[in-house]
Amino acid sequence: ARSYGYDKLHFYQGDIAGYEGVSSVDMVVTLHACDTATDFALAKAVEWGAQVILSVPCCQHELNGQMQREGAGYDKLAPILDYGLLKERFAALLTDGLRAKYLEQSGYETQVLEFIDMEHTPKNILLRAVKTNQAKQGSESQVWECRKFLGIDPMLGVLLDKGTES
């Protein structure tokens, strides 16, 4: 970055969960941070007040493991949740949808976009969030109802302390 004159652009490699090297940033970019590593990166971006967040999530296993047969909404979604492949894909989409909603709750205008054709990679979802400092109305109740219905507790909600009904 320095060789191109970007002296304020920094790249860091390591475990984001415990990283404490900065107090604020302009932009956070994540690419294929596996499972809850994406959640830790998004939580740090919110904590640092990043003006822009660009995140391409990778594998999303957390909610797949949390959706159990005892969940309140399991019977209604049995046509999807009874089949491993469908449950895995549903959990991945649900994870990214909830991440988008948590970012909206945190004052970001958020979009979920396809950033590359499916023929190149099935992991082609981009979460694009721009800070507005205005929480989107209704997103908290939507997330709460979804969590209650499926009996899930997403990591990003825990990290952002959005784990209870408001």
Predicted ranges, named:
Residues A1-S166:
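Class I S-adenosyl-L-methionine
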